[in-house]
């Protein structure tokens, strides 16, 4: 299913706009990919506008965590989702997106990548 991202058919006053053309394919978008915490990693590569590709991450169990004090990147297992500034209900559903605070084996980290579009979870360790 797609989402229409073009202009709505209403004016600011509530009146109807006269349609000058039909809806176009470039005005369509996708449903959001809600990356969840799982026991295995599931990805899918999709084609986007201009023949480019996006890697959708459906479930993830590990994250690439950057430790600023040691200046090293470590692969760590994700334990749970602690906080999510995008939506507070995402915490109990264990949904991970950019800005989410996750608990890992190394410690708490904030997600810096966009898992639904990058296909990987990169995070920065919080101290």
Curated annotation (Swiss-Prot):
Organism: Thermoplasma acidophilum (strain ATCC 25905 / DSM 1728 / JCM 9062 / NBRC 15155 / AMRC-C165)
Keywords associated with the record: Ribonucleoprotein, Ribosomal protein
Region (Disordered): 1-31
Gene it is expressed from: rps8e
Family membership noted in the UniProt record: Belongs to the eukaryotic ribosomal protein eS8 family.
Name used for this protein in its record: Small ribosomal subunit protein eS8
UniProt-listed Gene3D superfamilies: 2.40.10.310
Family matches, as InterPro entries: Ribosomal_eS8, Ribosomal_eS8_CS, Ribosomal_protein_eS8_arc, Ribosomal_Se8/biogenesis_NSA2
One GO term of the biological process aspect: translation
């Amino acid at each position: 299913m797609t989402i229409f991202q073009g202009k709505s058919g209403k004016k600011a006053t509530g009146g109807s706009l006269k349609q000058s053309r039909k809806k176009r394919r470039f005005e369509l978008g996708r449903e959001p990919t809600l990356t969840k915490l799982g026991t295995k990693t599931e990805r899918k590569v999709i084609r986007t506008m201009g023949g480019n590709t996006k890697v959708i991450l459906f479930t993830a169990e590990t994250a690439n965590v950057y430790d600023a004090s040691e200046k090293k990147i470590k692969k760590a297992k994700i334990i749970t989702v602690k906080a999510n500034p995008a939506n507070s209900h995402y915490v109990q559903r264990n949904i991970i997106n950019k800005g989410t605070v996750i608990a890992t084996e190394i410690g708490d980290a904030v997600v810096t990548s966009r898992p639904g579009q990058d296909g990987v979870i990169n995070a920065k360790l919080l101290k």
